[in-house]
Amino acid sequence: MGPLPRGRVLYELGVRLISFDRPGYGGSDRMASRLVSDVAADVLAIANHLDIERFAVIGRSGGGPHALACAAMLPDRVTRAGVLGSIAPRGAEGLDWYAGMSESNVREFTTAAAAPESLIEELGLTAARIKADPMSHVATLGPEMPESDRRVVADGGIRMLLAKNFAEALRHSAAGWIDDALAFCAPWGFNLADIQVPVLLWHGEDDVFSPAAHARWMAGQIPTAELLVLPHTAHFGALEVVPDVLSWLIR
C-alpha cells in the first residue's frame, strides 16, 4: 500500500497492520504469470501462519485490486476491505478505461496489453534509473500531477517515504512492477459482483494515475460498496486519509 502510517497512529487506533511484498517486489520471490487473484493464497498463508482468524484488508493504488481479490475470495476470513485510488479491471464494460489517465500510465498499460516483451525492456530500464536515484523519480512524476498531488508530495517527509518505497520495491529487479502491469491488463480471476463483505472505495476526483471513473464503475459492480470521492484531491491524497480508512475498517 506504499508508505505506511506512523507507529503512533496505529497505536492510537489500536490497529495491528501487517504488510507484505507482493511477488517480485522487495524481498519476495517472483511468481511469473500471476493473476491478481493469486494474492488471496498468499494472504491466507500469512494469516494462518500468524494465527489470525478474521481480518480486514486495505490496498492503495496497485494494492487496490489485490485487496478486492481477498474480499471476493476469502469471505469467511475478511471482515472489510478498504480500497484507495484503485484501477478497475481493464475489460470493464461501459468504462472508457484510459479516459483521464496520465500519459505514462496509458503507455505502460497499452504496452502491457499489446507488447509484453517491450514492457519488460522499458520497465527494466526505468527501474534501473529509479534504483540509482529514487528521489529523482519522485520529481519526474511532478509534470503529470494535478496541483493537489504536488501539494502532498511537496512535503519533504512524504517525498523521502516515497523514494524509500520505490527503492525497496525494486531493489532486486523490476519483476513485481512488470507482473503487476501484466496482471492488471489480464482477467483478474474473480468477479467484483461476488464480493459480499463491506468495501470502502476511496478516490480523489482529480486522480490521473487511476481516474475516479474507475471507482465509480466498481461501485456499481460491488453490491456492498460504499463510494467516497473527494473533490480537489488526487492519487497521493490517499496517503493523508489512510488513518480514516483504517478507522472504518475496525468498526
Task: Put a short name on every predicted segment.
Residues 224-251:
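Catalytic active-site module of serine/aspartate enzymes centered on a nucleophile-bearing elbow/loop
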Residues 53-97:
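Conserved hydrolase catalytic core segment
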Residues 195, 201-203, 207:
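Short beta-strand/loop motif that positions the catalytic acidic residue
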Residues 208-214:
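Conserved alpha/beta-hydrolase "acid-adjacent" motif
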Residues 10-30:
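Conserved alpha/beta-hydrolase
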Residues 1-8:
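The serine-hydrolase catalytic nucleophile loop
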Residues 101-190:
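Alpha/beta-hydrolase
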Residues 37-56, 66:
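Conserved acidic catalytic loop of the alpha/beta-hydrolase fold
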